[in-house]
Swiss-Prot record:
Residues 218-241 are annotated as: Disordered. It comes from the Archaea. One of its GO terms (molecular function) is rRNA binding. This is Small ribosomal subunit protein uS3. One of its GO terms (biological process) is translation. It comes from Ignicoccus hospitalis (strain KIN4/I / DSM 18386 / JCM 14125). InterPro entries: KH_dom, KH_dom-like_a/b, KH_dom_type_2, KH_sf_prok-type, Ribosomal_S3_C_sf, Ribosomal_uS3_arc, Ribosomal_uS3_C, Ribosomal_uS3_euk/arc. Part of the 30S ribosomal subunit. Binds the lower part of the 30S subunit head. PANTHER family: 30S/40S RIBOSOMAL PROTEIN S3, SMALL RIBOSOMAL SUBUNIT PROTEIN US3.
Amino acid sequence: MSVAKKNIKKYFLEQALTQVKVDEYLAYKFHSVGYSKVELQKTPMGTRVIIYAERSGAIIGRRGQTIKQITKVLEEWFGIPNPQVTVVKVEEPELDARVMAFRLANALQRGFHFRRAAYTTLRRIMGAGAIGAQVKVSGKLRGERARFEKYIAGKVYKSGNQVVRLTDRAIAHVLLKVGVEGVEVIISKKSEEERPDDEVRIKSPEEVNEIVQKIREEMQQTQPEAPTLEETVEQSGGETQ
């Protein structure tokens, strides 16, 4: 392997590692305001940092003070040149697995019973239009021995291409008096562009009539017209009786 290829490989590994570190830092700092993810984009003017969160105003801060602090940390701690921070609001937080995982972890930290908090999270996800959802809580739930409880609603994909296309998964941890508890949220969702392969939808009568009419028009365009009696006689060279 040439030196140039090694340098390219090292460069992309360093970029990926930097993004993971920045993501962990922002998740630790803003988990209570619905932090979702971060994107780093290289530009000729520097690095564009896009932060996705449920409560974007809490990350911006009063008069932009919080964003200024984030910019300083990104530049000094993580070595990101000229970071330009942009905060984007998550439009459907109930369909974002990481936002819901942090919500569930915060509810456990505030003292809510794990089963009640899990079912509340599940209902909100399904109420937002998800295909299915799974919520898993693990730790010392009701005794000295660690265990887990899992709650499922709808259809949750666990294998195949639909896991990549339609499934969102996130994990969060919370420190309680009894120890550390973990939560896992899996959401199967669909959009106008991405739909499940096994989805069956019955067309409405209006859609069926529209399809039938279209087929009839295509058949009329492709089907040749029947020849008249005179044309038939001329082609055969005979006479009508």
